[in-house]
Amino acid sequence: MKNGIHPEYKKLLIKVGSNIFETMSTHPIGEILMDVDFRKHPAWNKDSGNVVNQSNKSVSDFNKRFAGLSFDSKKEAS
């Protein structure tokens, strides 16, 4: 392996709320502060609801305004 061509591999702290996770990375900054808890993402935690819709006012307003709008392709036009 050639010297001087690879980025430095160092400790990285990931902060989510009051929890801190430690890992190794080539990320240039030593820590990442997460706004949204990745453990509550609806993709792998069906009980948590939709985090984006709960925390984002624009998305919430859109959903209220277009509550009856459907993109279901199975419905036939009458």
From Swiss-Prot:
Binds the 23S rRNA. It comes from the Bacteria. This is Large ribosomal subunit protein bL31. Belongs to the bacterial ribosomal protein bL31 family. Type A subfamily. One of its GO terms (molecular function) is structural constituent of ribosome. GO terms for cellular component: ribonucleoprotein complex; ribosome. Part of the 50S ribosomal subunit. The keyword Ribonucleoprotein applies.
